[in-house]
Curated annotation (Swiss-Prot):
Residues 439-467 are annotated as: Disordered. This is Dihydroorotase. Pathway: Pyrimidine metabolism; UMP biosynthesis via de novo pathway; (S)-dihydroorotate from bicarbonate: step 3/3. Zn(2+) 2 binds at residues 146, 180, 234. It is an enzyme of class 3 (hydrolase). Belongs to the metallo-dependent hydrolases superfamily. DHOase family. Class I DHOase subfamily. One of its GO terms (cellular component) is cytoplasm. Binds 2 Zn(2+) ions per subunit. It comes from Methanosarcina acetivorans (strain ATCC 35395 / DSM 2834 / JCM 12185 / C2A). GO terms for molecular function: allantoinase activity; dihydroorotase activity; zinc ion binding. Catalyzes the reversible cyclization of carbamoyl aspartate to dihydroorotate. Substrate binds at residues 62-64, 94, 317.
Length: 467
């Protein structure tokens, strides 16, 4: 007997949108078809008029715990994810303490296991801790980074020498490096030059397009020389997209798979430098808001496959922290709950096709971060039943008072969105009828591919000792 029977729905399957029914048992999709004769099931969801899609995978969140729980914690952040159709997240390391060694990793893992209602991975931080990276990899971190090439929240930025050393070590481990690409030297020079500027768009001026482009170019050269797998976080500029497109074209011409992937955020897709006046310091994030030419390049890159995925860079701060002058306010905006609804609205408005939305919010993130091996990322028999059920006709404005993050505000206030009616995680309904339907701690830790058990470590030590 199936646990859940979804009927009267439509799915995107084998390159077309078609009517279907889905049976779910023991957390997995067990059957996809039509007109099932099911005598009974624990739950029947009549999805008349709605689409059933893979739930989102957000590879870039800052859930702020430990150390900054006034802004967010694992429970509130994961509730926001579930309410927005996200069933898997990957948390970044710039917490207090940062996730840079065994102790800090195990502290964060314990908290996440106790509180998260969605499945999760944890990235390892990179500072001067090169000797700790192997240990973190074997503990099960998903990837390393984001590695900050320039100053940002948490103070984990590193210099050029350490950056190269880190990438070399990550290459040895066979791991993935995730990169925040901004040129710190350029940023500091512009900060000094513009120290009298008090306008809100000051932040875009000290981190201009050239700041990102310079860092991306430097990183691409290192990636190529070291042959390390890498992922660029939150690309935001016309210039960076052009570089990525060129490198991918050259790889394809030589019948090679690119060594890197890249992401874009909803705030760089759907907000612009024109929003500074409306948002003031609430629009401050790293990298900053960009002009219309960059936004057009991002949309084109998303459609033609240059950009691999969309991630929220959910980085919440309280209203009281953001309601300051542009220099004093911290960088970052909340976004995990609005990622999928904004992307669904973009499909509704023909900004990108549904098939591409599914690729950039689920399948591509799963592949890039090794989650496909754990059954994530696709609506197919044998995969985890991580699903969202949405009625694309239900376009509604985003309101901060309907969201679940502790931030209490959103830069997307009033913008069109399509929110899910149901979110399922491993066959459990965690969001339905506008309410959370899951207990803290039901989320599972998704071990990275470098994970080793204590037995493996002992065996490895014995083998090393006998050489």
């Amino acid at each position: 007997m199936p646990d859940i029977h979804i009927k009267n729905t439509r799915i995107y399957y084998n390159n077309s949108l078609r009517p279907a029914e889905i049976l779910i048992e023991n957390g997995k999709i067990t059957k996809i078809g039509k007109d099932f004769r099911v005598s009974s099931s624990d739950m029947v969801i009549d999805a008349e008029g709605a689409l059933t899609l893979p739930a989102g995978i957000d590879v870039h969140v800052h859930f702020r715990e430990p150390g900054m729980t006034l802004k967010e914690n694992w429970y509130t952040g994961s509730c926001a994810a579930a309410a927005g159709g996200i069933a898997t997240v990957i948390d970044q390391p710039n917490t207090i303490p940062p996730t840079t060694d065994r102790r800090s990793f195990e502290q964060k893992l314990k908290l996440a296991r106790k509180k998260s209602i969605v499945d999760f991975g944890i990235n390892g931080g990179v500072t001067g801790n090169i000797e700790k990276l192997r240990e973190l990899w074997r503990l099960g971190v998903t990837a390393f980074g984001e590695i900050f090439m320039a100053e940002s929240t948490g103070g984990l930025n590193i210099n050029e020498e350490t950056f190269e050393e880190a990438l070399a070590e990550i290459k040895k481990l066979g791991a993935l490096a995730t990169i925040h690409a901004e040129d710190e030297k350029m940023r500091l020079e512009l900060e000094q030059l513009l120290k009298g500027d008090v306008s809100y768009d000051y932040h875009s001026k000290v981190r201009p397009n050239a700041c990102e482009a310079s860092a991306v170019q430097s990183a691409l050269e290192l990636i190529s020389r070291l042959q390390v797998r890498a992922h660029f976080c939150h690309l935001s500029t016309l210039e960076a997209v052009g570089m990525i497109r060129k490198e991918k074209y050259l790889a394809k011409r030589e019948n090679k798979k690119p060594l890197f992937t890249c992401e874009v955020t909803p705030h760089h897709l759907f907000l612009s430098a024109k929003d500074w006046e409306r948002l003031r310091a609430f629009g401050k994030m790293n990298p900053p808001l960009r002009g219309s030419h960059s936004i057009k390049a991002l949309v084109n890159g998303l459609n033609d496959g240059t950009i691999d995925m969309v991630a929220s860079d959910h980085a919440p701060h309280l209203e009281s922290e953001k309601d300051l002058d542009i220099r004093a306010a911290p960088s970052g905006v909340p976004g995990v709950e609005t990622l999928m609804p904004l992307m669904l609205a973009a499909v509704r408005k023909n900004i990108l096709p549904l098939s591409q939305m599914i690729m950039v919010t689920s399948w591509n993130p799963a592949k890039a971060f090794g989650l496909d091996r754990l059954g994530k990322g696709w609506l197919e028999v044998g995969f985890d039943a991580d699903l969202m059920i949405v009625d694309p006709r239900n376009l509604q404005p985003i309101r901060a008072d309907m969201l679940h993050s502790k931030a209490g505000w959103t830069p997307f206030e009033g913008m069109d969105a399509v929110f899910p009616e149901y979110t399922l995680s491993r066959g459990e309904v965690i969001w339905m009828e506008d309410s959370i339907n899951a207990k803290p701690g039901r989320g599972e830790f998704l071990e990275g591919s470098g994970k080793r058990s204590e037995e493996d470590e002992e065996e490895n030590s014995e083998e090393t000792g006998s050489d």
